[in-house]
Amino acid sequence: MTNIRKSHPLTKIINSSFIDLPTPSSISSWWNFGSLLGICLAVQILTGLFLAMHYTADTATAFNSVTHICRDVNYGWILRYMHANGASMFFICLYLHVGRGLYYGSYTYTETWNVGIMLLFAVMATAFMGYVLPWGQMSFWGATVITNLLSAIPYIGTNLVEWIWGGFSVDKATLTRFFAFHFILPFIISAMVMVHLLFLHETGSNNPTGIPSNMDMIPFHPYHTIKDILGLLLMLTALLVLVMFSPDLLGDPDNYIPANPLNTPPHIKPEWYFLFAYAILRSIPNKLGGVLALVLSILILAIIPLLHTSKQRSMMFRPISQCLFWLLVADMLTLTWIGGQPVEHPYIIIGQLASILYFSIILIFMPLASLTENHLLKW
């Protein structure tokens, strides 16, 4: 008799995706982040669901409802801080996951890669709207500044912004719709994750060498499940340490001041995971140019498969490309730091140089380095 795991219509889908899935034996811990992102999404949906039971999306009561969750709801404080810091963990895993894809050439699976880029945009949109919900000073002014960027679009910009606001400023209508979208998007993201996995399982996983590993596969369970559980324990430990010991470490103190349209905070800045893009936006003096640079800083990932000029897929055996990759990482960290600094000398020029370097590495230096390495192979 065939094992029910392999014959039942429902369990055989799970079996072929998570149990008997043939997986390269050589994949390292850099391949853990996909499963960690899945766990992050589940944690965010669950904590978010319970928070939504007590939250009110109204300008008069939103701030107080969050305070009520933290003070009066049983374990409300842990729900709130797990959700807020879970978002930070989500983005750490996301950036490491994308970085892994860049380093090991996973972007040559173009369908999986493109769905991944759409997922990145969806998660960023969700996180932005979630940051608006507590209705503190940074929530209100962050929403005002970021939505206002759309007014840079020629001709329709102003109408578009007022349409998104639901009025002539960020107000009750804006908060209500942001809550609605913040609630629905994670479920859309879950569906997109299924598509992401569907495309991945069409081709199978890449591996550190970038060489096809069809002749050296092992079942996903128990080998990689055990490995993923180790990553999960490490991530949950980090998250719980953050939540229990310094829950406000990554937040902004200004968000503990209720939103006041008459009082602008001295430094408006988004959450830390958007600072690199915010620094690129600020480094261009022109509004439309800044908005385009902001969008392109993420959208540039879509053309990376076209810029792949190397004869090898992975960077494992390409030292020049490796140096450029780590330079790009250092550059992104520099941009993240600059994004949190005031707009004054020397931060302005550092931000501009880091922004130029960011695009130059991806568009010019990396393809050239790959061509150089191709020539070196002939020696």
UniProtKB/Swiss-Prot annotation:
Heme b b566 binds at residues 97, 196. The chain crosses the membrane at residues 33-53, 77-98, 113-133, 178-198, 226-246, 288-308, 320-340, 347-367. Gene3D superfamilies: Cytochrome Bc1 Complex, Chain C. GO terms for cellular component: mitochondrial inner membrane; respiratory chain complex III. Heme b b562 binds at residues 83, 182. SUPFAM superfamilies: a domain/subunit of cytochrome bc1 complex (Ubiquinol-cytochrome c reductase), Transmembrane di-heme cytochromes. It is a multi-pass membrane protein. A ubiquinone binds at residue 201. Component of the ubiquinol-cytochrome c reductase complex (complex III or cytochrome b-c1 complex) that is part of the mitochondrial respiratory chain. The b-c1 complex mediates electron transfer from ubiquinol to cytochrome c. Contributes to the generation of a proton gradient across the mitochondrial membrane that is then used for ATP synthesis. Heme 1 (or BL or b562) is low-potential and absorbs at about 562 nm, and heme 2 (or BH or b566) is high-potential and absorbs at about 566 nm. This is Cytochrome b.
